[in-house]
């Protein structure tokens, strides 16, 4: 069986969010049962020398969009520690000129042009390489055009005649919505796709709606999120469409790469440890206190937050409760970037409080050290399709404090239940979050209970093995391949 993954970002080459981790790790678990190729843009931030990314010979290709020819080139390397080919599509006008995966302040129309061009280039390069995929696995709105192309422009193309499509929703809030004329730029058959059973949504083109309608299976990244998006509260005006295709909707929990996130071998840590030696974890806490200029006190727990600084992640709750957090017997490390107002708030807190320190930006090595150093990991998301941060935190023995939504509900067993590995609150407001934090601080004073919970968290299995089997069964079901 041949599986083609298409995504805007793939770890470790390019990463802005959890999508990169999923596409960079799930194929590893599938490799023994399928032949896999991954396609992603060659962003300007990708280090070609570091990852030994080389240009494919005679790969220059010209494609026309909006009556303008555009030049593409193909580069390739292997996914680390695998035999999986990762193909990078280079275009100087749309991707290679930017140092970020998702540059800020782009013209929205231009953003659509970027991923239309990428999606069509994926189709054409797969043909040029003779990679006749049994299943194309598209991810989020950036590659939502692929199911539409399969249904329209390539509908009678013999090369794609037996190809099925899986579309994965990592975050329903970002759907790719623009005016009807974007279909002309895409050279897409408007008479076929622009209707209520295709991509038309409130007199606009909605790429995600089209992908949901035309894909053979639609995957949400956790069972709870799959149920939530069928409701008006979480459905982002797409719940009606999703209820209509509920027969092909699946909820499969994401995992993390246990080789990448491994406190026993992680070189970013001051001291390595595992579930049998998590007393050594304290050395990482001391290192983080030194790094951020906090006064170390073993009786004060460290609470970390590593997140995009946007409303979805519950940063407004931290803003609302900032005075209360300063008065707790705990220290805080906040890391992230995003909304300018939240970035400025974090900088102010770092400069004007005794127990809160922040890092505005993202540093993967520092993030791993903070995971290892922290006693608790705060994740008060308004909604969370799956969430990987709480899985990483538990892997490193940091107990998550989460709101019971989406993948957080599926992965965290809240205190005081048996085998609890974290703490939950149920209402999205600052006082409920504060009460959950206070509960965690109370447990911290009882080292027997705290260490039992830490052991339970570190022994929780959120590797890709179980989820990969569900994906593989789904691929086989729609392709009739074994």
Q: Which role does the model predict for each range below?
A:
Residues 1-482:
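Catalytic cores of nucleotide-sugar-dependent glycosyltransferases that transfer UDP/GDP/TDP-activated
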């Amino acid at each position: 069986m041949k599986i083609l993954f298409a995504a805007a970002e793939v770890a470790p080459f390019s990463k802005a969010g959890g999508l990169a981790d999923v596409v960079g790790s799930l194929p590893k678990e599938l490799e023994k049962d399928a032949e896999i190729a991954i396609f992603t843009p060659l962003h300007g931030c990708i280090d070609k020398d570091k990852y030994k990314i080389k240009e494919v010979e005679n790969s220059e290709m010209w494609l026309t969009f909006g009556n303008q020819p555009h030049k593409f080139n193909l580069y390739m390397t292997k996914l680390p520690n695998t035999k999986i080919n990762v193909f990078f599509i280079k275009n100087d006008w749309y991707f290679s000129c930017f140092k970020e995966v998702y540059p800020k302040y782009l013209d929205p129309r231009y953003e659509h042009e970027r991923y239309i061009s990428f999606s069509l280039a994926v189709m054409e390069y797969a043909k040029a390489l003779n990679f006749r995929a049994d299943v194309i696995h598209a991810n989020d709105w950036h590659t939502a055009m692929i199911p539409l192309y399969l249904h329209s422009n390539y509908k009678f193309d013999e090369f794609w005649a037996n190809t099925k499509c899986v579309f994965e929703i990592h975050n329903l809030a970002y759907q790719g919505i623009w005016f009807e004329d974007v279909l002309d730029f895409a050279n897409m058959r408007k008479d076929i796709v622009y209707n209520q059973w295709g991509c038309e949504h409130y007199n606009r083109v909605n790429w995600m709606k089209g992908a949901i309608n035309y894909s053979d299976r639609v995957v949400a990244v956790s069972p709870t999120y799959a149920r939530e998006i069928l409701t008006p509260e979480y459905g982002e005006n797409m719940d009606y469409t999703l209820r209509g295709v509920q027969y092909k909707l699946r909820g499969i929990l994401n995992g993390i790469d246990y080789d990448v996130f491994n406190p026993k071998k992680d070189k970013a840590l001051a001291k390595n440890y595992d579930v049998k030696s998590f007393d050594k974890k304290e050395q990482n806490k001391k290192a983080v206190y030194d790094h951020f200029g906090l006064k170390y006190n073993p009786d004060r727990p460290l609470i970390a937050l590593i997140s995009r600084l946007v409303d979805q992640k519950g940063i407004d709750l931290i803003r609302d409760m900032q005075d209360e957090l300063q008065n707790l017997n705990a220290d805080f490390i906040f890391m992230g970037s995003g909304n300018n107002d939240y970035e400025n708030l974090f900088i102010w807190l770092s400069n004007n409080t005794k127990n809160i320190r922040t890092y505005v930006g993202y540093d993967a090595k520092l993030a791993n050290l903070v995971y290892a150093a922290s006693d608790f990991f705060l994740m008060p998301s308004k909604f969370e399709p799956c969430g990987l941060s709480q899985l990483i935190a538990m892997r490193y023995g940091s107990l998550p404090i989460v709101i019971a939504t989406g993948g957080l509900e599926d992965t965290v067993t809240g205190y005081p239940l048996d085998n609890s590995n974290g703490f939950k609150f149920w209402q999205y407001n600052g006082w409920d979050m504060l009460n959950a934090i206070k509960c965690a601080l109370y447990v911290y004073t009882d080292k027997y209970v705290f260490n039992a919970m830490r052991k339970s968290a570190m022994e929780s299995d959120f590797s890709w093995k179980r989820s990969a089997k569900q994906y593989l069964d789904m691929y086989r079901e729609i392709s009739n391949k074994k």
